[in-house]
Amino acid sequence: MEDQASAQLLGPVEIRQLAEKLDVTPTKKLGQNFVHDPNTVRMIVSAADLNSDDHVIEVGPGLGSLTLALLDTAQKVTAVEIDPRLAQQLPLTVAERAGQFADRLNLIHKDALTVAPDDIDHPTALVANLPYNVSVPVLLHLLQIFPTIRRVLVMVQAEVADRLAADPGNKVYGVPSVKASFYGNVRRAGSIGKNVFWPAPKIESGLVRIDVFDPEHQPWPVTDDMRKAVFPLIDSAFAQRRKTLRAALSGHFGSGPAAEEALRTAGIDPILRGEKLDIADFVRLARVTAAQEQA
């Protein structure tokens, strides 16, 4: 790979020209903000720690800023784009600016939330400037259906980045924080200013990195069965976050006393609130619940 010329990345002028050619105006409905700074794109790819054998999913490639840099590095890039004009243009942009890597691009014209396991073959990484309005649902959906993903590096709104990487007890700790940590170790990986986007958003963005648990060293089984047992507990615990766990989980367990019994068996104080529990606590509670149901 090293003996091939690098892709020609897009700058502000090229982004505007492409948008004008396609009669594309970034829409709030689709959460579109196009990155037009090559240095930011290079930084994102570097922070993702990609290897030459990686198969990367990119959601919302837009005009191709990040796509071109990913093609430079990865073995294969599957770009998922919902906008028909952008989906039609992306292969043309790649052919023009990174023709030597064109065979590495796989394009799916689809809503990322409807992507199915059979749509993408063994992806190993997710690197994307996620559409702001669906960033968390898309992230969790792809982690759920593609257990082969080992690394995630996504750009999201700063407040979403803070939420995803928050620890128990933090005021922004909540459902996204706990569910993301079911799959791996989550951390903030940098901040992105407004001026690298067109149009410039009103708030800053942040990078979030997830190092997905190694299948041979998972702290709990990262399986569909475990997810289905754990995630409803998380949802119930945070549905009314000011309630104690005993009260918040009473509906899930059928009564307050039943919830308290399960919590105490799991070694969790029933008067705590959900925001004090980490993912390991919820997994332990799910296991207690499963054991009670089998008894």
Swiss-Prot record:
Keywords: Cytoplasm, Methyltransferase, RNA-binding, rRNA processing, S-adenosyl-L-methionine, Transferase
Name of the protein: Ribosomal RNA small subunit methyltransferase A
Segment forming the signal sequence: none
RNA-binding keyword on record: yes
Subcellular location: Cytoplasm
Gene that encodes it: rsmA
UniProt cross-references to Gene3D superfamilies, sorted A to Z: Ribosomal RNA adenine dimethylase-like, domain 2, Vaccinia Virus protein VP39
GO molecular function ontology, one term from the record: 16S rRNA (adenine(1518)-N(6)/adenine(1519)-N(6))-dimethyltransferase activity
Species annotation: Corynebacterium diphtheriae (strain ATCC 700971 / NCTC 13129 / Biotype gravis)
Cellular compartments per GO CC: cytosol
Similarity comment: Belongs to the class I-like SAM-binding methyltransferase superfamily. rRNA adenine N(6)-methyltransferase family. RsmA subfamily.
Role according to the record: Specifically dimethylates two adjacent adenosines (A1518 and A1519) in the loop of a conserved hairpin near the 3'-end of 16S rRNA in the 30S particle. May play a critical role in biogenesis of 30S subunits.
Domain of life: Bacteria
UniProt keyword Repressor present: no
Residues given in the record as S-adenosyl-L-methionine binding sites: 33, 35, 60, 81, 111, 129
